[in-house]
Amino acid sequence: EKAKQVPTFTPLVRDLKVDRTLLFDALKKTHAWIDIDGPFDLGPGPRMSARTQSWAYELSRCMTCGCCFEACPNTGHANQFLGPAAISQVRLFNAHPTGKLNKQERLRSIMGADGITSCGNAQNCVRVCPKDIPLTTSIAQMNRDTTVQSIRNVFGSDA
């Protein structure tokens, strides 16, 4: 009886299966993948520093379970916040040598009203993440990166 009273943003499909459409829509909006086909000259295999590999590995452990999305008071149908998982994936893919080719596109996707500024810093996402991913660290870094991108946009710099 109590289980029926727990409020959720994601509709329950059946036991242990929820509709993660909002989460996947956020990942699509933020271009949370690396293009392997297209006009890019990929050249030799990309290299990452050991330091970058270390924190990128932590972010790559995300299994898109939606726990962070569900625990966040700023996500759901009433609020269009992209959620911590999508923002963390933007950081992950922007750090990848090949993923950097779409860095500006990803940053623009989190610069709107539903993006980085909608995070209320409740930090529920970190508390519930089953993989202990440092989501708030990613959100803080993406906040910095979007600020830098905004300045570049004002002055017309592509770098």
Identify the meaning behind each predicted range.
Residues 5-159:
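Ferredoxin-type iron-sulfur electron-transfer modules in oxidoreductases and energy-metabolism complexes
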